[in-house]
Swiss-Prot record:
UniProt subcellular location: Cytoplasm
Organism: Methanothrix thermoacetophila (strain DSM 6194 / JCM 14653 / NBRC 101360 / PT) (Methanosaeta thermophila)
InterPro entries membership: DNA-dir_RNA_polK_14-18kDa_CS, Pol_omega/Rpo6/RPB6, RPB6/omega-like_sf, Rpo6/Rpb6
Domain of life of the organism encoding this protein: Archaea
An MF annotation (GO) of this entry: DNA binding
EC numbers, comma separated: 2.7.7.6
Quaternary state and interactors: Part of the RNA polymerase complex.
Cystine pairings recorded for this chain: none
Protein name from the UniProt record: DNA-directed RNA polymerase subunit Rpo6
Annotated Gene Ontology cellular component terms: cytoplasm; DNA-directed RNA polymerase complex
Pfam families noted in UniProt: RNA_pol_Rpb6
Keywords, in A-Z order: Cytoplasm, DNA-directed RNA polymerase, Nucleotidyltransferase, Transcription, Transferase
Gene behind this protein: rpo6
Length: 60
């Protein structure tokens, strides 16, 4: 996922979904002192380790 370009809407959806996963007890994929799921998800996004992909429709 590193280097892939996401729209601002895709980034918001990915980070939000990942923050919810973390809040619900999913394992954190990075070492961090933070306990805020949103901060953790943002850091995971920055590092490119979020295990979520985006499937786009082809443009017509």
């Amino acid at each position: 996922m590193k280097g892939e370009k996401y729209t601002r809407f895709e980034r918001a959806r990915i980070v939000g979904a990942r923050a919810l996963q973390i809040f619900m007890g999913a394992p954190v994929l990075i070492r961090t002192d933070s306990i805020d799921p949103l901060e953790i998800a943002l850091e995971e996004m920055r590092l490119g380790v979020i295990p979520i992909t985006v499937k786009r429709d082809r443009k017509r």
